[in-house]
Amino acid sequence: MRYTIYVSQAAKVFSESDLSTLLERSRDWNTAHGITGLLVYRYNNEFKRGNFLQLIEGTEDAIQETWKRISSDPRHHTLIVLDEGDSEARMFSDWSMGFRNVDEKNLANVSGFSELGSDEFWENVKKHGLPDALSTLRSFYDGV
């Protein structure tokens, strides 16, 4: 099973309706291509922008095809792959695309979270490498 975890910056602020449409289309695509995963959206009040954090998992061919689609989508930019690799089993097997719209209260409960791009984030990257994206996503999946 192949997986890819990435972050990106939304090209615009996503309303609940925008997110619902995005999820509906993503779930249709994912079901048709055997993709499962989790999508996290967060609007940052300080920077007045939204960010996505997503894990997709499936066969290597399905991930490559889906990644081409994701990376050319004009609804976001500045895509950064945090991690990719192989796993023995699906991590989000029941979700064609799980979703969380995260606010400040949720993030306060995530161990080791620092705002993407903040001074604290880059200090942690310098000291420890990239944060453990899998455990962060698992925290959202488990219902932080």
Regions found by a protein language model. Give the residues of each.
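Charge-rich, low-complexity N-terminal segments
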Residues: 1-144
